[in-house]
C-alpha cells in the first residue's frame, strides 16, 4: 500500500492510494475558446451543485478546487471507476445545461455571442452535436509526490490572486482556499 501526504491549509492528511483508482490528479476543465462564462453566480452555483452530486453519486473526491471565469482546476480522484469517465459525464451534462441556461437568460448581455461561439465550435468537432461548451480533454497531471501535490494546490489557490480578483486566496468564494467555500473538499 502507498500513502500520499496531502497538505491543505497547513494541515497534513494521510490518504492511502490504490494505483488503479486513487491516484491524485491535477485536472483542468476549460471553456471553449476560453470564454468567460463563470462571471455569473448562477453558473458557478450550478457547477458547485454538479460537483457535489458527483462527489455523492459518482465517488468523485475533490481535495482542492477553484472556479475561474473560463476554467476549473481541481486536485481529484475517484474511489471507484475512472476519473476520466466521471469528468466526461460531468462535462457532457453541464455542457447541455449551461448552454440552455445561457440561451434562456434574458439578463445575459453576451448571450448571442456565446451561443454562436459554442455552436461554431460544435460544428467543427465531430464528437459533438449542436454545440461545444468545454474544450476536449481534462489535461490530467498525475501528482506523484507530496511536493507536487502541495505545488498544485498552491497554484490552484493562488489563481484568483494572480488574476487580480482578490488580494488573498482565502477571500475567493469559489475556491477550496476559502474556509466557507460552498463545495466541501476532502480534508
What residue spans do the PLM features occupy?
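Short catalytic/metal-binding and nucleic-acid-binding patches
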Residues: 1-187
Amino acid at each position: 500500500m502507498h500513502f500520499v501526504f496531502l497538505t491543505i491549509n497547513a494541515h497534513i492528511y494521510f490518504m492511502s492510494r490504490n494505483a488503479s483508482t486513487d491516484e491524485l490528479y491535477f485536472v483542468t476543465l476549460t471553456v471553449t475558446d476560453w470564454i468567460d462564462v463563470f462571471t455569473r453566480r448562477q453558473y458557478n452555483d450550478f457547477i458547485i451543485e454538479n460537483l457535489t452530486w458527483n462527489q455523492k453519486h459518482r465517488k468523485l473526491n475533490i481535495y482542492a478546487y477553484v472556479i475561474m471565469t473560463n476554467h476549473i482546476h481541481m486536485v481529484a480522484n475517484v474511489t471507484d471507476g475512472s476519473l476520466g469517465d466521471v469528468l466526461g459525464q460531468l462535462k457532457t451534462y453541464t455542457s447541455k445545461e449551461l448552454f440552455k441556461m445561457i440561451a434562456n437568460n434574458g439578463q445575459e448581455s453576451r448571450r448571442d455571442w456565446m451561443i454562436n461561439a459554442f455552436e461554431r465550435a460544435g460544428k467543427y468537432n465531430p464528437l459533438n452535436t449542436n454545440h461545444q461548451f468545454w474544450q476536449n480533454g481534462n489535461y490530467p497531471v498525475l501528482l506523484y509526490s507530496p511536493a507536487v501535490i502541495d505545488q498544485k494546490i498552491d497554484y490552484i489557490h493562488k489563481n484568483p490572486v494572480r488574476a487580480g480578483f482578490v488580494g488573498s486566496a482565502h477571500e475567493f468564494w469559489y475556491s477550496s482556499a476559502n474556509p466557507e467555500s460552498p463545495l466541501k473538499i476532502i480534508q
